[in-house]
Amino acid sequence: MPRYAQLVMGPAGSGKSTYCATMVQHCEALNRSVQVVNLDPAAEHFNYSVMADIRELIEVDDVMEDSTLQFGPNGGLVFCMEYFANNFDWLENCLGHVEDDYILFDCPGQIELYTHLPVMKQLVQQLEQWEFRVCGVFLVDSQFMVESFKFISGILAALSAMISLEIPQVNVMTKMDLLSKKAKKEIEKFLDPDMYSLLDDSTSDLRSKKFKKLTNAICGLIDDYSMVRFLPYDQSDEESMNIVLQHIDFAIQYGEDLEFKEPKEHEDESSSMFDEYFQEHQNE
């Protein structure tokens, strides 16, 4: 039987560890066994138990304290991840060979790991050799995405990971439970966006014609190919969490031996998901 994996990615502070902790709790409520692997060698603490922790293999602090290497925080993290890539046998021993595994990999937040370093791509290829079906889960902080330019920046970060890893990817706006009522109304337009409408909002502040043309090209690419869409993730709302899990399960065909149901908001009905979520929370 196949094994299943989520690569939980996103900028620092986007809520990756919180996502892993709450998703494990949600799956336990559904009688599903889910394990977590920490792949951040700079992590200090997290609110979940792990089946494997990269800090048992190598830690950023140890690398930075090595007088022969003389690395800073970012250089130290890159060194740790490259060392990890050369020691995948450690991960294989930690994972074992249990069938029907479902594992969340809590990844570091540095974007260079996905843009111009081969480490994460090598990890995906290794997991696939171990018969894992892998889905990328790219998180962005909803509090960061309430302005058009920041939203476009978040889309480009998600797109860079998607192109680099070449795996199914679900993009998620986290911390929806922390937004005010006004902010929730503002962010609704970013969940299933009309990029040309956002373009009109953005370019009025641009003084350079070159930047206007670039922004127009980026928005056109995103809108014409429907390459990036976001799902809301509210850790206080079980339905919101279940919708995200359904989309991930569909991407990797989890439970295909069972009678499988597509996410009820899939494709043409996707807008109803956002309407339902915000209707439920409009009076908060």
Curated annotation (Swiss-Prot):
Site keyed Stabilizes the phosphate intermediate: positions: 74
Keyword Hydrolase found: yes
InterPro entries per the UniProt record, alphabetical: Gpn (IPR004130), Gpn3 (IPR030228), P-loop_NTPase (IPR027417)
Spans annotated as Disordered: 261-284
Coiled coil region boundaries: none
MF annotations from Gene Ontology: GTP binding; GTPase activity
Pfam families per the UniProt record, alphabetical: ATP_bind_1
Record keyword GTP-binding present: yes
Family statement drawn from the similarity comment of this UniProt entry: Belongs to the GPN-loop GTPase family.
Its job: Small GTPase required for proper localization of RNA polymerase II (RNAPII). May act at an RNAP assembly step prior to nuclear import.
Protein name: GPN-loop GTPase 3
Naturally occurring in which organism (per UniProt): Bos taurus (Bovine)
Source taxonomy: Eukaryota, Metazoa, Chordata, Craniata, Vertebrata
Gene: GPN3
